[in-house]
Amino acid sequence: MKKVSDIHAIKIIFFITATYVGLWAIRIPTIKDQLQTDYVGVGYIMLSFAIGSIVAMIFANALILKTSTKSILTCTLIAEGCLWLPVPFIHELWLFMVFSFVFGMSYGAFEIACNVYASNLEVREKKSMMSGFHAFWSLGVLFGSLITSFLLEWNYSFIFNILLYVIILLPLSLYFVLCLESQVETKSEDSSKKNIFFIWPLLIFLLALIAMANALTEGSVDAWGALYMRDFIQV
């Protein structure tokens, strides 16, 4: 069988992980009811996830330099699939927060590795492709949300929903990650200079503010949209 090109493979990997995000976005009310918590408790879960993601992002570059983007993607894709399996059986908020932190670390490392691989493809192919990669991410969120919505409408259980996604998506993600080339990152000649964290120019701060604003709007929809629709609009 002809091997899938790494360009198409990384697009599908974006799509697969985003499908899990779609599952999460629609099932947040289910998780809230399962934990018997309030909106503050849901906020703690989101905060734990965000902190875990940030921690992983800080160390992701060093891990990629020691291994490769393909290795990090393989580990995080396996983790993302397996970490979903215990979710329906957790009923304590504090335990779910710890779990959310670990989940966030996996997700953060995945995002860095996946975008690094995509950026290297742009350099290799000498053309802009990032918008196309992220288009598959958006399609994945839409697809995951749509299928989960159908399963909810048809009264399928949360456990069935998760098993269906993991059984299908985990093997697919492993197949497509095997189609990737092994990219080994190397430190640049300027790596010995002072850490850029302390010498960020104004432009970097502006870009960071724009990214934060975008994350706030994205999070308000992804994380709270389903709760708002159920509890206030009563859909």
Locations of regions flagged by a protein language model:
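Paired small-residue
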Residues: L83, W94-F103
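Cytoplasmic helix-loop-helix junction between adjacent transmembrane helices
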Residues: S100-A135
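Symmetry-related core transmembrane helices of the 12-TM Major Facilitator Superfamily/SLC fold
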Residues: I159-L178
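Extracytoplasmic gate region of multi-pass secondary transporters
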Residues: W24-A25, W200-V235
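C-terminal ends and interior cores of transmembrane alpha-helices
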Residues: I78-H91
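Primarily marks hydrophobic transmembrane alpha-helices of the MFS/SLC 12-helix fold
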Residues: K70-L73
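Helix-breaking motifs and short loop linkers at transmembrane-helix boundaries and internal kinks
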Residues: Q36, S68, F89-W94
